[in-house]
Amino acid sequence: MLRSIIGKSASRSLNFVAKRSYAEAAAASSGLKLQFALPHETLYSGSEVTQVNLPAKSGRIGVLANHVPTVEQLLPGVVEVMEGSNSKKFFISGGFATVQPDSQLCVTAIEAFPLESFSQENIKNLLAEAKKNVSSSDAREAAEAAIQVEVLENLQSVLK
């Protein structure tokens, strides 16, 4: 009996200490540290930013410093990185975002391109071609075309 009372008491104390140290660590950081990586390059490496808006599977989310830790699957769409009054927008084909308790955000994506690098005319042509390939008799080609259509339609809606 005494052992269970001591065990519960120690457990409560450890929980309080853990919560308290988390709160102090969160208060100590001033901004969100962003790691934005692709397989072939790193776009941001521990850079301090104001906010990052993400196209998550659960809906669009905005991440600020001291955000609740989470892991999100990212859909094709725009990642907006806000640095003070400046904003940079990247179109990603998908990926993952992990928010750490110490105001760190790690975004990993297969591809990411600045929005200004896209041409509406090019997207329109690629989308028409992909839509033709969706009805292909080759199952693999049809599946790849369906993915292209999803990504290109998202990109086209962002560029309008």
Swiss-Prot record:
Subcellular location: Mitochondrion; Mitochondrion inner membrane
CDD domains hit by this protein: F1-ATPase_delta
GO cellular component: mitochondrial inner membrane; mitochondrion; proton-transporting ATP synthase complex
Transit peptide location on this chain: 1-22
InterPro entries assigned to the protein according to its UniProt record, in alphabetical order: ATP_synth_F1_dsu/esu, ATP_synth_F1_dsu/esu_N, ATPD_C_fung, ATPsynth_dsu/esu_N
Listed GO MF terms: proton-transporting ATP synthase activity, rotational mechanism
Main location: mitochondrion
Keywords: ATP synthesis, CF(1), Hydrogen ion transport, Ion transport, Membrane, Mitochondrion, Mitochondrion inner membrane, Transit peptide, Transport
Single Gene Ontology BP annotation: proton motive force-driven ATP synthesis
Domain of life: Eukaryota
Similarity-based family: Belongs to the ATPase epsilon chain family.
PANTHER family referenced in this protein's UniProt entry, alphabetically: ATP SYNTHASE DELTA/EPSILON CHAIN, ATP SYNTHASE SUBUNIT DELTA, MITOCHONDRIAL
Its job: Mitochondrial membrane ATP synthase (F(1)F(0) ATP synthase or Complex V) produces ATP from ADP in the presence of a proton gradient across the membrane which is generated by electron transport complexes of the respiratory chain. F-type ATPases consist of two structural domains, F(1) - containing the extramembraneous catalytic core, and F(0) - containing the membrane proton channel, linked together by a central stalk and a peripheral stalk. During catalysis, ATP turnover in the catalytic domain of F(1) is coupled via a rotary mechanism of the central stalk subunits to proton translocation.
Quaternary organization: F-type ATPases have 2 components, CF(1) - the catalytic core - and CF(0) - the membrane proton channel. CF(1) has five subunits: alpha(3), beta(3), gamma(1), delta(1), epsilon(1). CF(0) has three main subunits: a, b and c.
Name the UniProt record assigns to this protein: ATP synthase subunit delta, mitochondrial
Organism expressing this protein natively: Saccharomyces cerevisiae (strain ATCC 204508 / S288c)
Gene: ATP16
